[in-house]
Swiss-Prot record:
GO cellular component labels: cytoplasm
Protein name: Arginine repressor
Stated family: Belongs to the ArgR family.
Pfam family, one: Arg_repressor
Length: 148
């Protein structure tokens, strides 16, 4: 199946159903006649920017445009435990399993001072464009994690 058609169907499923996890999404896609491997679905979800969001009946998968920025900021703030740096990089410690979401959130901000992020299970490595601007990048990250 064509990637664009599959991703369009994924968007449609997320708009029509409260999907709790990727396993449920695979089941819905199969019911619609679309067979997809879990690894392929995971890549599609990443490319589409799909995140876990608090819904009426618990957490669900959601497209980024369904979530106002302040809600995402609030969720990310709860997941961040600490922000530290040395003279070269910034390290963000998160709750277990939440580093990818925090890293993706920072990537979506597209700040020109951030060269890139690398996320593990509970740690995000933030690489600034210039080490001379680490304090400004930390301030920017803190501002964008605040609920205000």
């Amino acid at each position: 199946m064509n990637k664009q058609v599959r991703q369009s169907k994924i968007r449609e499923m997320l708009h029509l159903h409260e999907v709790g996890n990727q396993h449920d999404l695979i089941r819905l896609l199969e019911e619609a006649g679309i067979r997809v491997a879990q690894a392929t679905l995971s890549r599609d979800c990443s490319e589409l920017g799909i995140i876990r969001s608090k819904g009426l009946n618990g957490y669900r998968l959601a497209l980024p445009e369904e979530n106002p920025g302040n809600i995402i900021k609030g969720l990310v703030e709860v997941e961040v435990l600490s922000i530290q740096s040395n003279e070269a990089v910034i390290i963000i410690k998160t709750l277990p399993g939440r580093a990818h979401g925090v890293g993706s959130f920072l990537d979506q901000l597209k700040n020109s001072q951030i060269l890139g992020t690398i996320a593990g299970d509970d740690t995000v490595l933030v690489i600034p464009v210039s080490v001379a601007q680490i304090s400004q990048v930390i301030s920017y990250i803190q501002e964008n994690l605040s609920k205000n």
